[in-house]
Amino acid sequence: MASCASIDIEDATQHLRDILKLDRPAGGSNAESQRPSSAYNGDLNGLLVPDPLSSGDGNSTNKPGIRTMPPINLQEKQVICLSGDDSSTCIGILAKEVEIVASSDSSISSKARGSNKVKIQPVAKYDWEQKYYYGNLIAVSNSFLAYAIRAANNGSAMVRVISVSTSERTLLKGFTGSVADLAFAHLNSPQLACLDEAGNLFVWRLALVKGKIQEEILVHIRQPEGTALNHFRRIIWCPFIPEESEDCCEESSPTVALLHEDRAEVWDLDMLRSSHNTWPVDVSQIKQGFIVVKGHSTCLSEGALSPDGTVLATASHDGFVKFWQIYIEGQDEPRCLHEWKPHDGRPLSCLLFCDNHKKQDPEVPFWRFLITGADQNRELKMWCTVSWTCLQTIRFSPDIFSSVSVPPSLKVCLDLSAEYLILSDVQRKVLYVMELLQNQDEGRACFSSISEFLLTHPVLSFGIQVVSRCRLRHTEVLPAEEENDSLGTESSHGAGALESAAGVLIKLFCVHTKALQDVQIRFQPQLNPDVVAPLSTHTAHEDFTFGESRPELGSEGLASAAHGSQPDLRRIVELPAPADFLSLSSETKPELMTPDAFMTPTASLQQISASPSSSSSSSSSSSSSSSSSSSSLTAVSAVSSSSAMDPSLPRPPEELTLSPKLQLDGSLTLNSSSSSLQASPRSLLPGLLPGPADKLISKGPGQVSTAASALSLDLQEVEPLGLPQASPSRTRSPDVISSASTALSQDIPEIASEALSRGFGSSVPEGLIEPNSMASAASALHLLSPRPRQGPELGSQLGLDGGPGDGDRHSTPSLLEAALTQEVATPDSQVWPTAPDITRETCSTLTESPRNGLQEKHKSLAFHRPPYHLLQQRDSQDTSAEQSDHDDEVASLASASGGFGSKIPTPRLPSKDWKTKGSPRTSPKLKRKSKKDDGDSAVGSRLTEHQVAEPPEDWPALIWQQQRELAELWHNQEELLQRLCAQLEGLQSTVTDHVERALETRHEQEQRRLERALAEGQQRGGQLQEQLTQQLSQALSSAVAGRLERSVRDEIKKTVPPCVSRSLEPVAGQLSNSVATKLTAVEGSMKENISKLLKSKNLTDAIARAAADTLQGPMQAAYREAFQSVVLPAFEKSCQAMFQQINDSFRLGTQEYLQQLESHMKSRKAREQEAREPVLAQLRGLVSTLQSATEQMAATVSSSVRAEVQHQLHVAVGSLQESILAQVQRIVKGEVSVALKEQQATVTSSIMQAMRSAAGTPVPSAHLDCQAQQAHILQLLQQGHLNQAFQQALTAADLNLVLYVCETVDPAQVFGQPPCPLSQPVLLSLIQQLASDLGTRSDLKLSYLEEAVMHLDHSDPITRDHMGSVMAQVRQKLFQFLQADPHNSLSKAARRLSLMLHGLVTPSLP
């Protein structure tokens, strides 16, 4: 593999496209190279006669995995202002650049209620901090729910896991810092991966055992200690693509990518588990199973792995998106295949590829469309990865009328089907749902609508669990029983009488600021006729229009089936064939169905195989027409009419919408007056199912012409609709072709072998094929692309007469075939020779491995259950059947409904080949895995070449063997047809029961509806009676109350005043007298009091204070107003004028000064220039004179110095020799004497130490010379032998010698080393001798004592034995030292040392 520096840019770009299958036609070379040439059906269906529905019509090339986009002309710009209520649902997006303005009701401070379309159920209460989390706080699977929390006591990070079915809980711990990201491998996987802020990876396998959650650690990779905490860390699992043959998809990809701040790591978990058994494992100990990708300047934000795990896409805050090719097993470094800036260098926060991971079709390329986001997803862009052009731009902005305009901070997630993009705003309590449409052929994708749903709290993180179809009635979801009942009966009343509508159910688990909630959103998608109508012809899976376009499948629909016309039959061919068994995949190896899968019901087959008159007689009655229509429905759609009409059968959400199979059935009408049209739905079957279906019809030589005529008639009708049309995505752009031609030279042998194999299938003579006929690699590539061949070629290859005019309708030959014919120089020769016998075509393949083919047929029949067996089990299925895959169920029915045909072996396509087979330069890992398959394909190709070259004399035996096989097949076919007749009788009875049950259900519904209407009428009558009673009582009360009031008032006026006046007259006289007397007394007292009060000083002061307080405010206001209105403006004007004058004066003065300064500087510069010229000339002369003198002097000095040096060296060498000899003698003599003295001292000290008593007191050695010992000790210290130096000084029992050592060596040098260099006996002796006399050099002794005591080893037995006595002696000396001089500066250190010794001595006392 070449290094990254030597890669051509065009080569790398084309290599990336080859890996991702971006610009590959529908029949890529890799797909056809995987097809074995030993199977007759495979060669016939894949090479000779491609399915016209899958390759001919451009409208049918869209696959069932992704909803396609109708032809919509987008505007340039659009602004969508959301309203915040339920009317902001499915607002159409009709422009390339769209700005979406958030509603004011979505702000956190708004009091608006949540949306009625959102159902919330709390799961757990916990307070999360409101901020933008770059990773996920929650991970969702079908069985478990995991979310990150913090412990209440210590704040450590944990992950809470909840079982969705039993609500059982458990905790996962052991994280460093917070949990940066967590994710399940896929929805059905029990593997949970967590990544904390330190970069530690945890992978658990969760299981529910006896009602308890059991967690098993699979991988635990630990980062080095001290790794910086960083929240920019992400987990990216390799996408999981479900297989068609898998019932339970719990296996997950072993590849996971980790995004750190400065790098990305891709880990192969299987390799890690095989090489390590115990966890955790440090990352430094792992040598294989991972690869590191570096290439971004700032931290990484998002990433994605291709489904085959060979390409990694990374997005960073530096604005770049880069694609890396990775090989985990090899030694090659990852290389950058492509890079670009999608948002002009702004930080990226989103990288989503629009792949359908729910029902991925092998023909649909991965990574076709890409969604990128920047600035916390405030700007989203849709990209085409073939042309790298922006298709649409969405910008989110805050409400401009809001008081607090907080910019949006959006979290985005794409559902598995790539149909809906869900966004949550961290700064607002709202969820957005955007619908996504794609068109693979035209290379277009866009967002078609946006829906706004208000919540009660902002969503910080969320996980999608289910996005499915549902039925809505008055904006509510139907119950399960009514949902099935209304499916078969709603369309009989027409589109205007519908009570239910197609809806979408989105189930999320959302982390709010206050709680974790289960959120369910139900809404009706956009039903614009301009958008929905083209979907029925572009897509091959469920859509939303079944409520308006679905015909009745009950009795009314069957009754109207006999009044069809010729355009109805033509409309059948426009519908795409179901991709699960009708359409042959041309990009990968086709799904090779057995002949049993093409088996039609006995009623239709007998009518075709017997005679044309039998088909005309079948239209004599209405009942026979109805049964014929029902049987043809079963044959074409592979869905039994019982399962389509039975309202009691449980259906998954995907099956509630009309699939093209039902649309095909519903549009099938028959003409009762024409026998050819009556049989055309059954005779159309060979056109839909090429290959084995034709052999199934032609049972004998006498019936070949009948079947051929029916085939010719149907092909004439189907031919204009099945012509191949060029598609924009099927042709390569010039840059792609040029880059591909350079990369294809190494693959010429493979293409040549494939061309030979296809040449045999196309009956090209061997003489036309030469090794040098392949002119270019592009021609060979075009040969491997699918070339649609129509019905006449099918007839010619099978030995059937296609009728006149069929030979003109054939596809254009490929470039290689044209080159071959030009080299042979036979312009009159035909590309297709005379059609051989059918036995000649099949003998070479059937003789190769007939027994193996029969065994594979039995395996295929064992895998697919018969329809009657499945119908018996459908009623007993529980609600878990709703989770089953609809495509797998239909494929099973398709294979089983035709399971009684012939015994031609058709091995089933391995569903993983389309994922493992890549471009010619795929990774070595994938090449090793597919080595065996390539070998088998090569062997089959060589066998085919050998069979072409065989002489004709071997063919009679092969023909005889083939005839014997055909006889056996015919015999088996008759038996299977009989069994199929019995099966169809049971199916007809089942259909009748289902129709009766549907009618009874409809009758019950109508009866319940009538009862509800009667009850509502009675209720309305009661309400009307109650209203009348209330109105009558109100009228009576108003009338009586007015009259009664007037009469009472009149009576009171006439009676009450006279009586009151008569009774109050004496009382009034008495009161007047008493009041007069009281007033006179009060008047006198009032006058006296008022006079006193007026003369009081307090009153005057109070009045003055009140007046001052009253006038203070107005006066201040008046002065302030006058000052502000009069004084300040006048002062400002005067100051402004003054400053203006000052400014003008200063400016003028500055200008004059500058002018004078410039003139002065110019004159001074001129004078200096004039004075400098003579000085410079003089200096130049002096320099030249100095140089000449210097040269002369240098020569003279060098000669004299050389002579003097030689003389001095001669004299010095002589004297130096004499002095050196004397010095060497003296030094050697001194060193030898010193060495002898040291040796003597060492021997003496050793002897004395050995003879010393155990009391610990050194034996004095008075005979040693003190100076010699100091010299020896100094030498030991210089050599670093500290222990020996202290030991010698202590052994001499001389305190002065010990002080000499202590003064020479710093205590930090002795005790600063991690292991103390002094042994325990030396430490004890040092402590004892230093403490013997603390009167002199107290500071030095105390410092050494403190360090020595701290370095005593209490576990040493010698230390434990002698420490008590030594410490007691030291304490006594310290006590004496403190008593002698208590105010000494060292008393504090001595007291601290005494306390330390007390703690050491006390435990040792008894």
Curated annotation (Swiss-Prot):
Coiled-coil stretches noted in the UniProt entry, renumbered to this chain: 971-1030
Subunit structure: Part of a decapping complex consisting of DCP1A, DCP2, EDC3, EDC4 and probably DDX6. Part of a complex consisting of DCP1A, EDC3, EDC4 and DDX6. Part of a complex consisting of DCP1B, EDC3, EDC4 and DDX6. Interacts with DCP2. Interacts with RC3H1. Interacts with NBDY. Interacts with Tex19.1 and, probably, Tex19.2. Interacts with LSM14A. Interacts with DDX6.
Name assigned to this protein: Enhancer of mRNA-decapping protein 4
Biased composition (Polar residues): 726-744, 823-832, 841-852
Residue list for modification Phosphoserine: 3, 6, 560, 565, 583, 585, 680, 712, 727, 729, 733, 745, 849, 876, 880, 884, 892, 895, 897, 1385
Ranges of Low complexity composition bias in the record: 609-631
Region named Disordered: 604-631, 667-686, 719-744, 782-855, 873-951
Top-level taxonomy: Eukaryota, Metazoa, Chordata, Craniata, Vertebrata
Role: In the process of mRNA degradation, seems to play a role in mRNA decapping. Component of a complex containing DCP2 and DCP1A which functions in decapping of ARE-containing mRNAs. Promotes complex formation between DCP1A and DCP2. Enhances the catalytic activity of DCP2 (in vitro).
WD repeat residues: 174-214, 230-277, 295-334, 342-393
UniProt xrefs under InterPro entries: EDC4-like, EDC4_C, EDC4_C_sf, EDC4_WD40, WD40/YVTN_repeat-like_dom_sf, WD40_repeat_dom_sf, WD40_rpt
Assigned keywords, A-Z: Acetylation, Coiled coil, Cytoplasm, Nucleus, Phosphoprotein, Repeat, WD repeat
Gene Ontology biological-process entries: deadenylation-independent decapping of nuclear-transcribed mRNA
Domain of life of the source: Eukaryota
Protein localization: Cytoplasm, P-body; Nucleus
Keyword Methyltransferase listed: no
This protein's GO CC annotations: nucleus; P-body
Location of N-acetylalanine modifications: A2
Residues with the Phosphothreonine modification: T731, T826, T879, T906
PANTHER family: ENHANCER OF MRNA-DECAPPING PROTEIN 4
